[in-house]
Structures are given as C-alpha cells and as structure tokens.
Amino acid sequence: MHGDAPVDAPVSGAMGYLLTMLAQDVGFPVPKGGASALTAAMVRRTGAAELRCNSVVTRIGVENGRARSVHTASGETVRVRRAVIADVSAPALYQDLLPAEAIPRRMREDLEKFEWDTPVVKINYALDRPIPWRSKSLCDAGTVHLGADDDGLLRWTTDMSTGVLPTRPFMLFGQMTTADSTRSPAGTESAWAYTHLPRGIIDDASADTIADRVLAVLEDHAPGFESALVGQVVQRPSDLFASNANLHGGAVNGGTAQIQQQLIFRPTPGLGRAETPVEGLFLGSSSAHPGGGVHGAAGTNAARAALGQHGLLGPLRKKVTSSLLELVTR
C-alpha cells in the first residue's frame, strides 16, 4: 500500500520492517492543525530566504556543462550562483527542463523506460460522530490498514498487476480528529482513505467506482459509517495531477518503489545520489533516493550534496562524483 511493490516482489517485505521500526521509534506524528501547518513551520525557518509562489519554471539554462540560469514562464531569468535543487520528477527535469544535449545518451535511453508508481485515489470524509468500528481496538488508532486478509491482499495485488478494478479495495485509513483534536469539532471525525488504481487506469469513472467500493468496505467494518457522513470529497488521479505536476497521473511516489528503480537504480541506473550529469544541478524530489513520503530525505540529500561541493574537500568530491557519473551514464 505504501509503495507499489506486490507482496511477492523482491524485498517487498522491507517496507513492513521499516514502518514497524519507525512506529516503535517515533510513532506516526501528524502536524497539529493540518498538513499546511508543516509547510508553515518550514516557511518560518527560512530566515532571509526569498520564496516565490506561482512562478512556473520552464527551462534550466546550461553553459559549459554547468547550470547557470533558471527561466520562468513570465520571462524572468534567475542567475545561478551556487546550485539548483530541482524538486520535480525525473522525467520533468531531464526531458522538459534541460536541453537534450546536456543529458548523456545512456541516461536519455534509460529515462524512456522510467516507470511510474500506481495511481492513487484519496477520499476525504467528514462525519458527525466517531466512527462506529466493529472492532473497538480501532477507535483510538490514528492510522488503520483495512480491507484485506492474507488471501484478500493477494487478490488485490493481482488485480493491480492485471488491470482489474478491485471489488474490495485494500486501503489506508486515517482518523485525523482522533490523532489531532483540532481537525474537527468535539464529537465528530475528520478522516480520509486512500487506495490505488491498477497501473495505467487513471480515468475519473474508475476512480469514482473505487471510491464507492471503498465506502462499502468501510461500511462492512464500521456499520453506520455511511449514515454518519455529512460530506466527502474524492481526489481522483486527475485532481492530484492538476494540483501538483509532480503527481503524474496520480502517482504520489515519484516513480515505482520496486527494486528495479530503487537505491542505485533511482531514477535511472547510476550512483543513487542527488548529483546529476549537469554540474551544480541536484535532484531533490521523490524521484531520487529514497523515494516518496513526508520525510524530506530526498531534499536533504540534495542540499547536503550541494553544500558538499564547497569547502575544503569540495573540489575533490565534485571531481570524483562527476567522473563516476560520466562512467555510468555515457
């Protein structure tokens, strides 16, 4: 569910171990007041940095193999002093923003085989009472994995890989007011569910069908759920993509999380690092290692790589990295 690896795929069980370790170590915290509170907190820590919203970047200028400028749709040109960290998908960076001659032939060929993760459908619910779970142990859980036993999970993953809309979707369900009482008035519940569509199926009708089936599964596990609903909003793959160009076709992880596109294979076979073949340009999105999630790791890796090219060992680190990149991409 958290990735798009079938249960029988190589190392698919690693995600379960990772989540279990995280739960034991730090739990699954949520921002008080909603997801926007996390963005607001980051803005408060930017100090003297200049933030520009709604400024669409159309091109990254490259001169003598180095990123030198960033160009926007409004015609503005921003000169690059130290580095560019691109928080965009790998296909968007290498196929849309950079000149073709700046990308090694082998990397261009590898990008033709880039694989997206499966589309997501997210349904947001407002309920006028707590969720009437059959199992009372779920009443205090912030996050619930719901909808399939072992056999059901196998059926669901088979449907995902064969292009069949699951009749009983497996889902992740979040009880937001249970986790954060500021999300809705006392005695009510703000919640959401998300599940996947089979790869390549992103039409609105299929998304709406899955949303109806998600509701049926919830009603099975919590009789009276539907009667408690006062509103719901379905975010289809088209809605997700319209709100964030990185969510290509409703894919939220910046590319498949399966082993063929992880670690040193992310986003293409290489070093598994944030550096790109263009000097001074770093990939800091979920298309880079370690992939999607609200963890900031890909951006942190990119920032550290950019800073690491300066200082006492910077020139040596830069030369070694660029030589290795040239070796594996040309």
What are these regions (language model features)?
Residues M1-A49, N54-S55, L247-T256, Q260-Q261:
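Active-site/ligand-binding neighborhood in enzyme catalytic cores
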Residues M1-V7, T167-L172, G224-H289:
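A glycine-rich dinucleotide-binding beta-alpha-beta segment and adjacent secondary-structure elements
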Residues V56, V62, Q235-S238, G308-R330:
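Active-site-proximal substrate-binding core of FAD-dependent oxidoreductases
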Residues T58-S184:
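Mid-domain catalytic core of redox enzymes
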Residues I85, Y125, A193, V214, ...:
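Hydrophobic, well-ordered secondary-structure elements that form the walls
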Residues P91-D96, A126, P185-V217:
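Conserved FAD/dinucleotide-binding core of flavoprotein oxidoreductases
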Residues P130-I131, G152, T162-T167, S184, ...:
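Flavin-binding catalytic cores
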Residues G284-L307:
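A conserved FAD-binding loop/helix module that cradles the flavin
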